[in-house]
Amino acid sequence: MSTPDAQAAALHAPVLAQRCVDLLAPALESDGAVLVDATLGMGGHSELVLEQCPHARVLGIDRDPRALELATARLARFGQRFTPVHAVYDEIDDVARQHAGGAVQGVLFDLGVSSLQLDDAGRGFAYAQDAPLDMRMDPTTGPTAADLLADADEAELRRILRTYGEEKFAPRIAAAIVRRREAAPLRRSSDLVEVVRGAIPMSAQRTGGHPAKRTFQALRIAVNRELEVLERALPRAIDALAVGGRIVVESYHSLEDRLVKRELARGATSSAPRHLPVVPEEDQPYLELLTHGAEQADDVELAANPRAASVRLRAARRIRTTPTRPSPRRRRP
């Protein structure tokens, strides 16, 4: 592990880490209890769980080989209580079967791009740093952001920007990208920032932060198929929970939080018609919500960790088993 990586791990403050542990800990008290950290990153959340829940072991999933290497070194002192797994988190059911016999006591998702990826100028995630337009969370597989910008037609670019970036100037930006690539390909983040700045009216650039923020978010989500992966992962994670197990999800924009809210609410609501005098067992809720709406970072957390500003945390507990539901077709992003 390089010195810069070691420094990054030491400085990285996981968001709402203690709150996550407090929510998960009641399910991790028995010997051999298993937590799946589905978004391992630099291992900050897992480290706190392993320190405060001495009977638990952690399966740490990440699609980024560099993050796995970094977290494995950080958590080496816990020995066999920590197992790194190179996978995408919609493979959580397979990971649970292979490493925990199918049922786990806790699942944690800390969604979005990690500090490691944001702070590495060479990955192309940050609009404030010039770098090749890559944006892949796993840099060993799949098309890059530059590939997407070169291959997608104007309508598809418009859809990506509007859907994943909630960008109201999506038509103007998509048209500008197509015009620019006819002259020269967009290969670097500075190329894309220049196009976005030229497409958005100056009056709109004076508010709302960096004008390319939403475009970069949209491309990152599209390149990594983040919402598709999350939509598959959430029901699989819930199905992998043993009764009494807990799931905690931290999301960082409304698109993620909407999916999380919907999936947890579905599990916490009866599926029976309202007029039935008795709710059949198979229609009874299988989750109990542990948070009232989405929790946010308080002033103390924000002062220590500004990246917590957009976090929305939701949690639930598995209260009964559910009939086996059909598994959506898996497609590796």
Curated annotation (Swiss-Prot):
One Pfam entry name: Methyltransf_5
EC numbers, comma separated: 2.1.1.199
Identification of the protein by name: Ribosomal RNA small subunit methyltransferase H
Class in the EC hierarchy, top level: transferase
Assigned keywords, A-Z: Cytoplasm, Methyltransferase, rRNA processing, S-adenosyl-L-methionine, Transferase
Stored HAMAP family: 16SrRNA_methyltr_H
Catalysed reactions, as listed in the record: cytidine(1402) in 16S rRNA + S-adenosyl-L-methionine = N(4)-methylcytidine(1402) in 16S rRNA + S-adenosyl-L-homocysteine + H(+)
Entry annotated with the keyword Manganese: no
Originating gene: rsmH
Family: Belongs to the methyltransferase superfamily. RsmH family.
Positions annotated to bind S-adenosyl-L-methionine: G43, G44, H45, D62, Y89, D110, Q117
